[in-house]
Swiss-Prot record:
Keyword Metal-binding in annotation: yes
GO cellular component terms, A-Z: nucleus
Listed InterPro entries: TF_fung, Transcription_factor_dom_fun
Keywords: DNA-binding, Metal-binding, Nucleus, Phosphoprotein, Transcription, Transcription regulation, Zinc
Organism: Schizosaccharomyces pombe (strain 972 / ATCC 24843) (Fission yeast)
Domain of life from the UniProt record: Eukaryota
GO molecular function, one term: DNA-binding transcription factor activity, RNA polymerase II-specific
DNA-binding region: 36-63
Subcellular localization, as worded in the UniProt entry: Nucleus
GO biological process: DNA-templated transcription; regulation of transcription by RNA polymerase II
Biased composition (Polar residues): 64-77, 96-118
Annotated protein name in UniProt: Uncharacterized transcriptional regulatory protein C530.11c
Region of interest: Disordered: 28-83, 96-134
Amino acid sequence: MLENSTAVHGVRLSDSPEDPFLRKRLASNTQLNQKKIRFTENENDLSPERAQKEPVSIPHGRYTWSTSPDTDSSHLPSTPPTVDIPFHHPHTIHSPTFTLSVSPDSQSSSATHQNDYISSPHADFSFSPPASKIQSHEPLNDMAAVHPLRPSHVSGPLSPPEPKAASVDHSINPAYNASFRLPDGPLWTEGSENLPSLDIQLQLAHIYFIYAHGQPYVLFHRDSFMEALKSQRLPPVLVLAMCAVAIRFWQTDKYDKNELFEQWFNRASAIAMANFDKLDLVYVASFVMLSYVCAATSKYWMFAGMAIRMVVALHPNKTPNLPYYDRPDSPLPFEIRVQLTRRLFWDCFMLDRLNSLYCNTQFLNLEDIHVPLPMRETLFMYKAHAVTETLTGKPSSPDSFTNANPTTAPIVSRNAQDNMGMLAYMIRMVSIWGRVVRCLKSYSQKQSNPYPFWHAKSTFKQLDQELYEWEKNLPNRLRYSRQTLLSYHMMGQGGQFACLHLIFLQIHLYVHRYAASISSVPFSHVKSPPTVFENQSAVLASQCANAICRIIQDCTELSISLAAPFTASSAYLAGTVLLYHYITRGSEVQASKAAVHLPIAKRHLAQLSVYWPALGMYAKALDAIAFHQGALVTPSVPPVIATVSKTNTTNTGVQQRGNVGVTTTGSILTQSSPALPVQPVPLAYSKPAPTTKSSLTELAYNTNVSLPPRSPGTGSLAAGNLPNEKAPSLMTMVNGGPVPGDIGEASIPVVQNLQPSTAHVDPESDLGRVIKICDWYQSPSSDVLLSKPLQLNSSEEMEQQCIDLSRHNTLLNLSSYGI
């Protein structure tokens, strides 16, 4: 702050007779142009020999600029500034005052200094301690907090302070000057001939931020991205990749979406692959979006691998201010660049872990990751700087980033956990997901393991403990409830909040689904768990399956788009558990919930298959399981068909959950209407109607809108007496059955108990592929039979050695999910 001027100043030091710090008086006219004096309490340390060798250390206090009578006032400001420098001394809490007097001993040496705060090159430096009766103007304990930047020494000329900008970089990363980043370089020109009109770009960008942003990847800072898009200053390859993602959700009849998608996708992938040797965040983000489009395909693995290797080569933990979609003449603020660099790295990390379900391979090693987790979205949008934790839970050091730019914004909170949002907790959960997949699939890929997965000494024990700690330490602001979901939806983060809890529930369901699902025979090398562990697994899997469907239904009712590809596996895993409870009818309560929630999972899978055609294998696999078990349903009793919701406009006009209906033909979930409505829904806060928020708030607080079906009786729908047909609502699950006329009149038919099916599954079919992906306990080489795994009788010793899952059932607050 005091070293900005290039003029040479003369400094004169003086003190009062009562000076308790220097303990001696200096000559008032001593010129110290070439001398350097170090202030100390011991006068013996102030020897002339040491004074000439040691640097000067200006005492902390209040500095006031004053002029002598013969000073040229044209070089001085109208109002003398005052510089506050914190002061601390063990004998007093009073702040001394230093007066800097400008003298006209010399003139400015160059005209380039005419804009300096003070142009006169000489200043007198006088010191006077405060009176003993005057109290300090600020507490001693708050000195460091109020004055975080304290000059410890002055080497060279002195100058008054200048106003500090909030986010101004003193230096630009040399990567901005790369040849391909020049104003007319290929980064800004290649692919521009394939861009649609600006109006279409803006529409697709708006759709992208509704459907894809934060589910789970966060690639852009929305305000700066939209501003650059409107001014047409974005790299064309980035815009093409964004348009290829957004057009999947664009509902229009004016254009051929398939043709536009192929054109934009092929051009963006060609540009990105041709420039894979140019390490830049633009190409990393392009590969991430291209892999997002190719979910559950071989290209997904290829594009994700390119993005992972490029972002690792950029060293995001060492270079925080990498260039992105900004230019050297208008760079993004330092805080935004730091967070975007972190977010792109963690996006690649989540790509790697989520893809491990399909390819069984993970490239990033946890021991090599030292990048701090992203901060909260609200802090990110307001360009704040915050300290967060690392993936291992240790607080990150702010020195590496604050030292890179000393003018960075002040740290918001010293508590790292307060600065972490849902994206940081989602990254931790995805990390656990990747290790769970690797751990459990090793049981079917390796011939020997020291302990089975349910054993207290197994490798899964540590992962189970991490799951428990994650749920236990989750902040209240991130715990699920319908009202919290609505609150985040009003901030544009509803889909991201739902994805956070879907990943958590999916991990539990992936592990414990073996105990409550119709699936294949377990691998012979995996020892069957004890009865106690199996029962706890069945309860936990059933709870998570119902909770997943309730989250999906809450998003539907609150008009929250939930289009993340990984949610297809969540809905499929939940559907298999619900189908098992519906067919076996081991519990009337579970069967009733399954009848309500099973069509929700089916509808979500059908909707995702429209957005991502490759994910249609999950919907077909669930239909195939129901088809193989369809013979178990009593022919005289029609199977259950459910309606997802029913519109009630008598009071508030909000949607209420409907009940179950029936059809007289076909098996459950085997009939699916090709005209399934998958219309895009706008964000609730974008509607101008004043009653929108209040209506959604009432709906969010209404957690008991779903009624269980009544038992069959005379005149019920189970007897075949259908009500008068009504026009189905937009949210009705249309699969051959009419909309019930009265809530609560549908019933669940009586079905036989489940018997092991001898139906073989073609490994090349959709069901065979899904079983290999989702059933970790299935041997890849064994025959696939649809049956309930037969458990062995466990001994008391085995039950004492198994993992206790009851803590999960206790900690999992099912009431928050509306169950």
